[in-house]
Amino acid sequence: MSAVFRKEFRSGLTSMTGAIFMAFVLILNGLFVAYYNFISASPHFEYAVIAASFLSLLAVPVLTMRSFAEERHSKTDQLLYSLPLTATQIVLGKFFAMIAIFAIPTAVVCVYPIISEAYGGGEVNLATAYGVLLAYYLLGCAVIALCMFLSTLTESQVIAAVLSLGVILVVYFLKSFSSMVPTSEIASLAVVLVLALACGFIIYAATKSYIAGGVSGLVLVIAAVVVYVVKSSLYEGLIGKILSAVSIFSAIESFANGVFDITCIIYYLSLAALFIVFTVQSFEKRRWC
C-alpha cells in the first residue's frame, strides 16, 4: 500500500492537476478570509471557512478524475491487479495520497486564524477556528471518497470530472430543495421507492452483479412498503428530512455557532468509509471482467 501511496502522492504533487487543485483551494479560502476577517473586520474565522467550503471543494474532481479513470483508459489498471496487494490496499493507497495532497493547502489555511487574530477584526476563537478546519478537512475527505468512487465507473477523465462535479452540485442544493418538496405521506413513499431502486442500481454499478443489485433494490422496496402499511405517519415530511440529511455541506454549519459537533465529524468519517467500500467493490469487480 505504501508503494501505491508514494506513487500517487508524487504524481499528484508533480502534475498540473495537483497544482491546480491546491492553488484553487488556497485562493478561495484566502479570498473569503480576506473578506470576512479583514475587509469586514469580523473575528469569526469559522464563517469564512464555512462560506468557502463548497466553492473550494468544487476542485476535488480535478484531483480525483485520474485516480481510476486514467488507469482504465491507459490499461495500466492491469498492472495494479498484478500487484501483490488486495483491492482494499490499492484503493486506500490512492485515497490516502489524495487526502494527503488536500492536507497541504488545509495546513496552510491553518495559519490564517493566527494571522487574522494579529491583523484582522479582533480576537479569534482559536478552538472554534481549528474545530471548523477539522470539519472542513473531513468534509473534503468525504467528497474525495465520493468522487474517487465515481472515477471507477468510467474510463474517461472528462466524464469522471463532469459526473463528480454534477453530483457535488446536486448534493449542495439538496437542502434548498427540501422546502420545496411535498410533505404528504404518499409522495414520501414514492420518493423512498425511487431511492430504493437507485440504491439497487448503485450496488449493481459497484459490483456488476444483477443479482446483488436486483435483490438489494427489491428488499428495500418491500421494506419501504411494509413500513408504510404499518405506520404511514413516519412518511410525513420525510422527503425534506432525507434531503436535509444527505446535504453534507450543511452539516458543517453547526460550527458557526461555536459548537464542536461530534455528530458532524462521525458523519463525514462514515461517508468517507462508505464510498471507500463502494470503490473497493467496484474496483475488485473489474478484476474478473
Task: Set out the residue ranges of the language-model regions.
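Hydrophobic alpha-helical transmembrane segments
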Residues: 1-70, 129-134, 161-162, 190, 201-208, 216, 228-238, ...
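Short amphipathic alpha-helical coupling elements at transmembrane boundaries
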Residues: 3, 7-11, 78-82, 152, ...
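Secretory targeting signals
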Residues: 29-36, 40-48, 52-55, 96-166, ...
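Transmembrane helix segments
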Residues: 35, 157-253
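Helix-loop-helix units of permease transmembrane domains in multi-pass membrane transporters
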Residues: 67-97
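Short aromatic-rich membrane-water interface segments that cap or initiate transmembrane helices
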Residues: 126-135, 250-263
